[in-house]
Amino acid sequence: MDDDEFERELERNNLRPDAGSWGWTPGRVIGILLVLGMAAFWLWAFLWSPRGHPDELDDPAFTVAAETRCATALEELREVPSAGEAADLNDRADQLVITTDILAAMVADLREGAPSPTIRDGELVSRWLDDWDTYIADRNIYIDRLRAGEDRIFEVTARDGDQITSPLDLFATINRMPSCQAPGDV
């Protein structure tokens, strides 16, 4: 096929683009919509999207009170002899009973001052305190093992593929309550 035949074929099948016509082809429309959609998304993301972490409390009143209560509990924990000072496994278990009771009292106090569970902050705090309850139960299991003569590593319950202390500590960090992290005294 020579050039003249090719030109005639284009005209006969109406395939020749008009030099002055841009045209709204489906591909162009889809492309423009995609670009506009991406631009709108990034505009929203930078200007109007919610800020902060999903676990961050809206009202800081609880976090201020909780940090104060947790700091008091940490001071009490520091008064208990360390594991290295324990004479034997029973002595270590006795130390852990004291520290676990301190933490249980702290959690009970935090629960009393927690926001209502019917609001978002209350739901978040309730889940966090439930994690504390799990951690305290793990400590009690460890105490029982020490009393039974088992000198094993302290293990905590897993949650979402990680130790229960990870979400517990993350919530405390996000809400600026560093004293409310797991103490690491075991």
Spans of features found by a protein language model:
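N-terminal intrinsically disordered, acidic low-complexity segments at the extreme N-terminus
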Residues: 1-15
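N-terminal capping/interface segment
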Residues: 1, 17-21, 57-63, 93
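Alpha-helical segments in soluble extracytoplasmic regions
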Residues: 59-144, 153-186
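C-terminal region of N-terminal signal peptides and the immediate post-cleavage residues
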Residues: 24, 40-62
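Hydrophobic alpha-helical transmembrane segments of multipass integral membrane proteins
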Residues: 36-39, 135
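N-terminal export and membrane-targeting signals
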Residues: 16-35
